[in-house]
Amino acid sequence: MMKYIYILLIFSLLFLKINSQNTILLNALIYDQTPSRNNDFQIPSPGGIAKGLVKSNLGSDNTPVLVAERSSTIHSPETFNQWFHNYPGVNLPINYQITLTQSTTNPNVYAYTNDAFFPIDGQGFDNKTNYPYEAVYRDERGTPHNFHFCLQIHSMFAYKKGDTFYFNGDDDVWVFMNKILVVDLGGIHGKATTSINLDRLGLTEGTNYPFDFFYCERHTTESHISIETSIELTCPGYDECGVCQGDGSSCCTKSNCNDNPNNKLNCITAQCSNNVCVKSAPSCPSINPCEAGTCIPNFGCSYSEITCNRTNCENSFCNKDTNTCERSPIANCVSCSNGPCITTDLCFPQKCDSKGNCVSSNKNCDDRDYCTTDTCQDGICIHTPIPKCVNCAGTGCITTNDCNPKVCAPDGKSCLTEVLCNDNKTCTKDFCFAGHCLFIPIDCDDVDDCTVDTCDETLGCVHTPLDNCIACTGLACITTDLCNQKLCTDNGTKCTEVPKVCDDGNACSNDRCISPNGTCAHEILQNCTDCGTFNCITLDLCSPLSCPTDGSTTCVSIPKTCNDNKPCTLNQCHSPDGICTAVPIENCVKCNQTNRGCLTVDFCNPVECSENGDSCIITNRTCNDYNYCTTDSCINGQCYNEIIQNCENCTNGIGCTTTDFCFQQICSDSGDTCKTVPLDCNDGLSCTTETCLGPNGTCTHTIIKNCIECGIEPCITENLCLPVVCGPDGSCLYNYTESTCDDNDACTSDVCTEYGCEHYTYTGCMNCTNGGCFTTPDTCNHYGCNFTGDGKCFFTHLECDDNDPCTKDHCLYSGDCYYEKLTNCTTPTPTQTPPPTQTPTNHSIGVNECDCCPEGQYCLLIFGHERCFIANDGGDGIPEETIGCPGVTTGTPTSTDGGTGHYTESGTGNPHLCDRHHCRSGMECHVINGIPECLPSKYKCLDCLDLHCEKQGGKTCFTIENQNYKPNIKGCKDDSCCKYTPTCR
């Protein structure tokens, strides 16, 4: 897109006159924009000039206010607000100056022209060092430029007649004068011209008004600007950013960065860099030999300063920037031999006397003017003028009476008095009152109410008579309207209006008196009949009025007759002008008879004259197209042949229409009947069910569950426990085996249901390596698995003999031994013999299992403890428990645990539970209600071990019945699969 900015502006941005004869320097604030941060810029479809985008009054923050939903090139009030306000990260403020040069043809006009107006090229987002990822935009020659920015100006001007404002350019330009919109050229557009004569704005000459200028460049590819101005713009004050009446927030300045008191209070050095305040870490560098610095938070740097030498009239200090002593002279000081003489009151300056001491003198303030009072204040001579004083050569003449002022005598050494109260006018009397001259008009009243009394400087008093005036007693009756003449009444004390009579005796005339000259007028009434004492006025000529003949006063109406004697015309009288018209009747046919006409109302049934013309005949219009797949009809005389959808036109006068495409209707071979043809939905597969869905004729193919394609027939499995497979010849065969659902777990019942294989666990069953073993709640008489032997189930009895004749030994139901003390019993002293040493052999279980059993014995897991047993105890079928092995990890007959010989973990003293070494491959040890049990490794319902519970404080793993358990449910989730839930107690 070719785009121009050719602006001829009569304005001053924010300016400073460098040379009042040659140039004007204009200060502007630019906000650099980029399409990647504000999508109001580089719009794909600019759209041209868009007036009315902003409100006619300037906003409270002196920027334009967007009118909502007015432009497709402005996305929202938020994006528009970023054009002329500081938004860190969205735009960048940049100060800019334009120099206007005085016109050579008109010295009151200054101008600036630039055919490549890119004021911030290489700056802001165009600086690739700081913003390397911002897009580059180029002109038609391929030269990169910064095309996206908004410029704003705020100033004041004193209006003078003849000021004008003219510009020619493109893109958004708004100018406000006195905060009112005077130039409205919004949008992205081509060149447009506007000129303003400020004389038409209703401004007061010499009065100061605010001037606000806003301009945005929002699109490629060219930029031109030409400015002219005759307006004298000024600014009351600039902020540190160079913005007229700004608040200093549009840029990084010394006040908000370098000299920010908060930085100094915390010993931080800050300076502006790329319009961003960069701060250092807190520090107070030493500046010896003058100072040593210490940082005190919220106070700043504290320094110890040296004392510098000085003379009598000098102040000395150590410069912290140069680290050197510097001296400055003391104002109004004279160095005398005996010390400094400092003048504190300049009206009495101090000086040295001959002895080197200070003496005071007086300042001479005489201005040799006799009309001033001369005084001295703070060393400055003040000459106060004496009111009403004339300065003569040798004296001052002061006037005390303004009617008789004092003036200088001819010699200038004395005063004379003047007389001023005489205006030399005939019509005034002259007086002097309280020192002021009074000139009072003379009284010319002739006591005549019908005269106007005035005074003429040449003639004196003049008495001019009033027209149409009658002098009454103490008042004048003046007639201003001769249609209502004023006369004296009530013995001359009152004026009364008497209307003028203008009746001409004609009932058909409108009589009136014309003010103010009193002329009678008689207007003849239109369409009026004079009936003597009254009139009859016709308002509607289709019903004229006439005088009655019965002696009454009621007018008679006679309707006007309109008839052209034609049967096919409509005769009417038009009110109120009474004109007769004859309108032809549409669709009417005149017959042979003179007054006979036939009117057609329905063109599908036209009306015609009879053969002899004495009557009308109704006929019918034929619309048959002889197509049996159309519906023939006549509407308002128009034939319609609507095509019947999905219809086949047969040969013998019928049409076959299909309403359901699952059953299509076609013509029979003879063409006189329709026949039905079903839609073929067969997909050629045996394991699908075909269905046609009407009326659209959509074929669906539903897969038959558990069906496989065989050569001869489809094979459908109705019972998952009896699957059907393809035979060698393509026929169906049943494929049933006994081991289909066997999970190789002796403690489960394996069944096949409609859902497939189901496995139900037997309660109280332990899965041994060679069959199952059902346990009992009686832990004193226990069934367990022989993991180290034949892997079958065997029975054990817990012995609780403590070899103490004074105790009664009990095996509790919980599996604990209880020794009841007997009364009146004495325990004999035993002979102390060391326990025999049992040395493990190579035939015992590995060191990670039972380390306590010698050859010929095996380890059993009883109540969670490993214990050593021999094969039998002499024929009763119950293994006999033996002593353990010596060492720190085994028990002995005299140990505190009763010499059970079970394995203990080093340093813990806790009985070792069953672990992975006691369960075959694919199984793991779980403890259910205190009883160890090998279960499948993926058995998710039981996952706590006694060892885990013991680490929680000597607890044991138990299972409780799960209330959420759902038996025989295929695809159970979470804990609904588990009949028991593990818990530590």
Swiss-Prot record:
Organism per entry: Dictyostelium discoideum (Social amoeba)
Cellular localisation: Secreted
Keywords: Glycoprotein, Secreted, Signal
Signal peptide: 1-20
Occurrences of domain PA14 (ranges): 102-247
Entry protein name: Protein psiQ
Top-level taxonomic group: Eukaryota
PROSITE patterns tied to this protein: PA14
Gene: psiQ
Main localization (coarse): secreted
Database matches in Pfam families: Dicty_CTDC, PA14
Annotated SMART domains: PA14 (SM00758)
A GO-annotated cellular component: extracellular region
Positions glycosylated per UniProt: 127, 309, 424, 491, 517, 527, 592, 620, 649, 696, 735, 767, 786, 824, 842
Metal-binding in keyword set: no
Family stated for the protein in its record: Belongs to the prespore-cell-inducing factor family.
